[in-house]
């Protein structure tokens, strides 16, 4: 049964568990735990439910996306797919198969980095793409998705 509140699934892909310690000159020193706490507080203030999943395993992310079906139509995804951005047809297909709107998020500006990072299997289907804002991009993405889901709910009344 769908939740009464809009639900945002915050997904973080491979190596994001190392946020704050891995290449801090690129990704900063804020940890994923800090990001999650900030996003949970923001979601609460916006009166939306937020669930967080981080995995280094593609199938676990696909399973989390599939589980979101129970919250449709008031559900959306904020995803930092990490390296799966450039390789995962499975995550793309899961997002499209579930049909929830999603925001693609990257801490760094992937377009200012190596050429292989310039291609995304998700961007053409995302409702928004945020990159290069550091961890501040998470709050922007959560707020955007919350507003979108609330507007969608209001339109159905």
Swiss-Prot record:
GO terms for molecular function: 3-dehydroquinate dehydratase activity. The gene is qutE. This is Catabolic 3-dehydroquinase. It comes from Pyricularia oryzae (strain 70-15 / ATCC MYA-4617 / FGSC 8958) (Rice blast fungus). The record marks 22 as: Transition state stabilizer. Keywords: Lyase, Quinate metabolism. Belongs to the type-II 3-dehydroquinase family. The active site is at 27 (proton acceptor), 106 (proton donor). GO terms for biological process: 3,4-dihydroxybenzoate biosynthetic process; quinate catabolic process. NCBIfam families: aroQ, PRK05395.1-1, PRK05395.1-2, PRK05395.1-3, PRK05395.1-4. Is involved in the catabolism of quinate. Allows the utilization of quinate as carbon source via the beta-ketoadipate pathway. Its EC number is 4.2.1.10. Homododecamer. Adopts a ring-like structure, composed of an arrangement of two hexameric rings stacked on top of one another. Pathway: Aromatic compound metabolism; 3,4-dihydroxybenzoate biosynthesis; 3,4-dihydroxybenzoate from 3-dehydroquinate: step 1/2. It catalyses: 3-dehydroquinate = 3-dehydroshikimate + H2O. It comes from the Eukaryota. Substrate binds at residues 80, 86, 93, 107-108, 117.
């Amino acid at each position: 049964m769908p939740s009464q509140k809009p639900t945002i699934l915050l997904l973080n892909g491979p190596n994001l568990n190392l946020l704050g310690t891995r290449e801090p000159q690129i990704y900063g020193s804020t940890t994923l735990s800090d990001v999650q706490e900030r996003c949970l507080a923001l979601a609460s203030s916006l009166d939306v439910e937020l669930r967080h999943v981080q995995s280094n395993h593609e199938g676990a992310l696909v399973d989390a996306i599939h589980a979101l079906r129970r919250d449709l139509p008031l559900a959306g995804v904020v995803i930092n797919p990490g390296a799966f951005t450039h390789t995962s047809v499975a995550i793309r297909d899961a997002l499209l198969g579930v049909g929830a709107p999603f925001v693609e998020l990257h801490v760094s500006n992937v377009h200012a980095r190596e050429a292989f990072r310039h291609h995304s299997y998700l961007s053409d289907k995302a409702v928004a793409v945020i990159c290069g804002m550091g961890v501040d991009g998470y709050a922007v993405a959560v707020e955007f998705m919350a507003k979108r889901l609330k507007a969608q709910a209001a339109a159905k009344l």
